[in-house]
Amino acid sequence: MQTDLSDSSFFNHQSVMTDEIMASLEHYPLIHNNQLKGIDATLGGGGHSYHLLRKYSDLNIIGLDQDPFARKSASKKLDEFKNRIDIRASNFADFVPKEKVSFVIADLGVNSNQIDDPKRGFSFQKDGPLDMRMNPFLDVDADKLIEALNEKDLANLIYKYGEERLSRKIARKIKLDLKENGKYSGTKELAYSIAGCFPPKQRYKKIHPATRTFQALRIAVNKEIEVLEKFLQVVPEWLLPGGIISIISFHSLEDRLVKSCFKNDQRLKNLTKKPITPSEQEIELNKRARSGKLRIAQLN
């Protein structure tokens, strides 16, 4: 993928559950004191950080993102707060803060601009290269991944990360296509091939039959589960006593990990027995918010 950072036209991400994130930080006992410091572990377009910096005039935030397009967009959005926002090129699992902070927020998964930009290859709504890398400098994209894996490993990946019951049939079809026809021309051709693995009556449902497989490939390319597991292990060490960690997830694999961590990590007090979900009003305004789940924990 050619990385042209001059094109930010697709980066118009609408942050999810902003009010709920703001409210979650009120659990921190010193939230209204001076010299607050926090980490936005998934900066994206800077939406959550923007609202936090506006509300808390003494707040300083470190914003992390591995996507250079996101960092450029966030830098523009947050320009008025440039003395209080420190944007870092980092995957959140690899970051090591120099000092402890009052809170950490994370909005997991792919964001709207990555989906909407066909050049990123995350979606089959518009044709694009089979890429799916959140960090465009990673070595392995989706195209290389499906070519490198054997049929069994590809099937296991689709089942594990996509929870797709037809994983074996889909993997067999993908490997057969690659053998007989060479590489796929793009996302639409792969999605069409996957859809052909389903009975005709299932091909035209509300959710496209390729959705779960695309999710699985995206998770694998970006090592999303491994990265989240590592992040959940280290993030309590980033917090001051009483500090807050707020995480929004968008699919069951992520949510189960966050739920388990907040429930079982002895360093944390789980503040959400059940996840907080978006309001009906927000879902009406932003359909992509509907699957969001917010969980909150506090350092003991």
UniProtKB/Swiss-Prot annotation:
Binding-site residues for S-adenosyl-L-methionine, renumbered to this chain: G46, G47, H48, D65, F92, D107, Q114
GO BP terms in the entry: rRNA base methylation
Protein task: Specifically methylates the N4 position of cytidine in position 1402 (C1402) of 16S rRNA.
NCBIfam families, A to Z: 16S rRNA (cytosine(1402)-N(4))-methyltransferase RsmH
Example of a GO cellular component annotation carried by this entry: cytoplasm
Origin species: Prochlorococcus marinus (strain AS9601)
Primary localization class, coarse: cytoplasm
InterPro entries: RsmH (IPR002903), SAM-dep_MeTrfase_MraW_recog (IPR023397), SAM-dependent_MTases_sf (IPR029063)
GO molecular function: rRNA (cytosine-N4-)-methyltransferase activity
Gene3D superfamilies xref list: Putative methyltransferase TM0872, insert domain (1.10.150.170), Vaccinia Virus protein VP39 (3.40.50.150)
Subcellular location: Cytoplasm
Entry's family note: Belongs to the methyltransferase superfamily. RsmH family.
Swiss-Prot/TrEMBL keywords: Cytoplasm, Methyltransferase, rRNA processing, S-adenosyl-L-methionine, Transferase
Reaction catalyzed: cytidine(1402) in 16S rRNA + S-adenosyl-L-methionine = N(4)-methylcytidine(1402) in 16S rRNA + S-adenosyl-L-homocysteine + H(+)
Protein name as annotated: Ribosomal RNA small subunit methyltransferase H
Gene that encodes the chain: rsmH
Top EC class, one word: transferase
Transmembrane spans: none
Enzyme Commission number(s) from the entry: 2.1.1.199
